[in-house]
Amino acid sequence: MKKKEMLILTGPTAVGKTKLSIELAKAVGGEIISADSVQVYQKMDIGSAKILPGEMDGVRHHLIDVLSPDEKFDVFRFSQMVKEAMQGIYERGHIPVLVGGTGFYIQAVLYDIAFSEEETDSALRRQLEEEAAQKGNAYMHEKLAAIDPEAAAAIHENNSKRVIRAIEYYMQTGEKISVHNAREHEKESPYAFCYFVLNDDRKKLYDRIDARVDQMVEEGLYEEVKGLLADGIPRSATSMQALGYKEMADHICGDCPLEEAIYLIKRDTRHFAKRQLTWFRRERDVTWVDRTAFAGQEDEMLAFMLGKVDEMRNLNT
């Protein structure tokens, strides 16, 4: 039976996915679904490097600017929203092109992993949240690393919700959440898909990250975060744990000087890019698109990707 088609374009932060994703979507008659856990929020434009309407070049985009910064956003809600978007895309006779660097979210959609909305009144959950409030994110991340090193390597310590969830899962079941996720990952995808991972020379990538952070600061990251705080968005909100926002909020609230905040954003973003690449290397059925192999020529990269799409379609009969 012929499967519905889906394309994925992902890769580490600042690798340059946006322009290529537009060209890919135009070439296949696609609509883009953002797999970015920050661009989904309104008023969080600079720190998320959000695509501007004028850059979309007529390609319809989904899951951008749809939530208030004080709203909860997790893989459960993401999966729901993506399924709704995909239904409309298929009805219009188009192909969904999932674009972004949140590998866990991509995996959930690609393999149709079932998530249920987690209970929020669990006594154990509250106990772990209180422990995190008292001892800090770094302590909880070390606690997870002692239980499940693989999960700790995949989850940033700032993502306290996922760290706590992983510890909670182990304490409730006796099983590492990384083992659970690996088992779920063995499922066959219900889609005919191409899963492209864009990469570049590490030094070039890190230099691009540093330059992007400098540009964000120049464009008004400080003012953007200050505005969010003035709007009453708590520093504990899911949105405010994002890279760039947490560090700048710490500075605004007097916890560190500006120079240190900028240094931490650059350092932690580089670490995040490294973890993203580690995640994608563990994924199966991916096609790596290395900028160095194409000397940075995006037309050649696009032609290579379209060739893979043709191969996928020939097999999907």
Where are these regions (language model features)?
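Phosphate/pyrophosphate-binding catalytic cores of soluble transferases and nucleic-acid-acting enzymes
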Residues: 1-317
